Every structure is written in C-alpha cells, then in structure tokens.
Amino acid sequence: MSYNGSYHQNHHSTLQVKSKFDSEWRRFSIPMHSASGVSYDGFRSLVEKLHHLESVQFTLCYNSTGGDLLPITNDDNLRKSFESARPLLRLLIQRRGESWEEKYGYGTDSDKRWKGISSLMAQKPPKRSYSISNPEDFRQVSAIIDVDIVPEAHRRVRLCKHGQERPLGFYIRDGTSVRVTERGVVKVSGIFISRLVDGGLAESTGLLGVNDEVLEVNGIEVLGKTLDQVTDMMVANAHNLIITVKPANQRNTLSRGPSQQGTPNASEMSAATAAATGGIQRPMKMNGSSDGSYHPKQHDANDSDSGED
C-alpha cells in the first residue's frame, strides 16, 4: 500500500500493519471499526495467507511503544498490539525456535537501554539468563487417579504415551499371589511387573515398581487371564494405559485421613476369618518383608516374561 493522499484521508479509520518475514515485507490495513472484533486466530490466519506460511511454524511479535519486541499469542496481547500502533503496527514474523526473544525472554531491550553505562561499571557478575519459552505443547505423561475409590493398599496409575518417542518401559511376568476370601487366605495366579527399562516412561514417573502386582488394566480385572492376554491388553491401550497395581512396597502408598484409619487391613481380616472358622492363626511368611506387605518371590530364569510394553 502506498502512502498517498487517500491514505492521509483514511488513516484514522484503518489500522495500518507492516509485517516482515525474512526479507519479505507486506503492508495491509484493518478497518478500525472491526479491529476490536479481530481474534488472534483470525489475525494469524490472515498473516499466514499473506506470507504463504501454511507449512511453516512461526511466531508473531510486534514493536511496542517502549521499543520492546513483544509476542502476540492470544486475543489480549493482540489487542495491546493494536493499541500500541502509533501510527503503524510493525509486525515481525519468525520461524519457531529462531527468535532470540523466544529463547532469552521478551521485553529486555528497553532494560538494557535504560541501564546505559552503569551496566558496564557493575562489579557483580551478571545473573544467569534462563530460557523460558512460551507455554505450549504441554502433555500429561502420568497421574495417580481415583484415590478416593481405590483401596489404600492399591494404586491406580495412568500412563500416557505420545507417539513412538518413548516406550512404556516395563516387563510383566506371571506368578503366585494371595487373596483373603471367606475360606481364608488362598493362593491364586497373578501378574507382576518383573523389570523396568532405564529411561522408559514407567521408570521415569516413579509410580510403578518391580514386583508390583497388576490387578486391572483399563478397568478389566486380570485375575484368571494369561500372561499373553494381559500383554495384549496393555499393548492395545498403550497410548492411554490405566493400570491398577498393588505396590510391593506399601510404604509408598498414599495414607488416608482419620476417617479411614478404622478400616481393617488384610492381616486383621485374616485373623477374624481364622477365629470365625475355629482355625489356628499362624504368622504368614512374607518373603523377608518386615512391613507386612506381600513381596512375590523372584522366579527362575525360565519364568515367562512378556515383551516390553
């Protein structure tokens, strides 16, 4: 757009924008009566179309009245950029990751100018600059859920796998567990975590441990299922795996409030069952554990082990 007589007549009714991407410049105008209703998404789409950036990840910045280069990331700071257009909104478009301000922080240019020569005479070493980028692409990778539903001795964990960048990172095996029933304590087959892979998702979250017993996979109880069936269930739900486990180390389970302290534990239920049936109460061997939790014995080398999930 050229600055001629018609511009001087109409510049009060339009917002003039001058955008720059690499060595490419564009000039366009936005009617002032509609500028207040322009959304960030609509403005970004307009810039994207003018500079043909459909396949380019880019950031938008503008020169404020104080001389700082500030980002445009939402409707609020887009409106601020319109207010600072005196008389022209200077827009800088950069590829994502190439911006100096994106790496070291926005709004630091005016601070350097006002310090002047005093910054050169400072005796103290400069503070370390931290790289704080725009908040985006945050993804949940793990969480403990249903704390108010799951029994105190159990833990329900959600593992979220994004793409193929990192495996779930744990192996499972079959073994023998115990259950407290009306007939007393009985041995049943169970599924246990046998190994955690270094750098895997399960190891990095710290929510799963070796010898933890797997009770449910995405709401489906694993009791009575084979090792291959449980493995297939985990692989099918790998991108949003919800696994309920009984941790081998009960010291790391979440403690409940005072209202939950009256709930009998497994040993008390076992004692009550033995007394009711007239049996003899004997201490149950816990594989060397002193905290009352059940740690399944390690199997031999010929134990079956699922592939890495």
UniProtKB/Swiss-Prot annotation:
Residues 156-249 form the PDZ domain. Residues 14-96 form the PB1 domain. Belongs to the PAR6 family. Its main location: cytoplasm. It is found in: Cytoplasm; Cell membrane; Cell junction, Tight junction. Residues 132-149 form the Pseudo-CRIB domain. The gene is par-6. This is Partitioning defective protein 6. Keywords: Cell adhesion, Cell cycle, Cell division, Cell junction, Cell membrane, Cytoplasm, Developmental protein, Differentiation, Fertilization, Gastrulation, Gonadal differentiation, Membrane, Tight junction. Necessary for apicobasal and anterior-posterior asymmetries associated with cell adhesion and gastrulation during the first few cell cycles of embryogenesis. Required for localizing/ maintaining par-3 at the cell periphery. Regulates mes-1 expression and/or localization pattern during early embryogenesis. Acts together with par-3 and pkc-3 in maintaining epithelial cell polarity in the distal spermatheca. Plays a role in endosome and Golgi body positioning. It is a peripheral membrane protein. SMART domains: PB1, PDZ. One of its GO terms (cellular component) is extrinsic component of cytoplasmic side of plasma membrane. Interacts with par-3, required for its peripheral localization, and with cdc-42, required for the activation of a par-3/par-6/pkc-3 complex. Disruption phenotype: RNAi-mediated knockdown results in a diffuse distribution of early, recycling and late endosomes and Golgi bodies and reduced intensities of markers for these organelles. Residues 249-309 are annotated as: Disordered. GO terms for molecular function: protein kinase C binding; small GTPase binding. Colocalized with par-3 at all stages in early embryos, at the anterior cortex of the embryo. Patchy expression observed at the periphery after completion of meiosis I and in meiosis II, which on completion of metaphase II, is restricted to the anterior 85% of embryo length; this decreases to 55% in embryos between prophase and telophase of the first mitosis. During the first cleavage, expression is detected in the advancing furrow. Along with pkc-3, is unable to associate with the apical cortex of cells that lack par-3. One of its GO terms (biological process) is cell division. It comes from the Eukaryota. The lineage of its organism: Eukaryota, Metazoa, Ecdysozoa, Nematoda, Chromadorea. Signal peptide: none annotated.
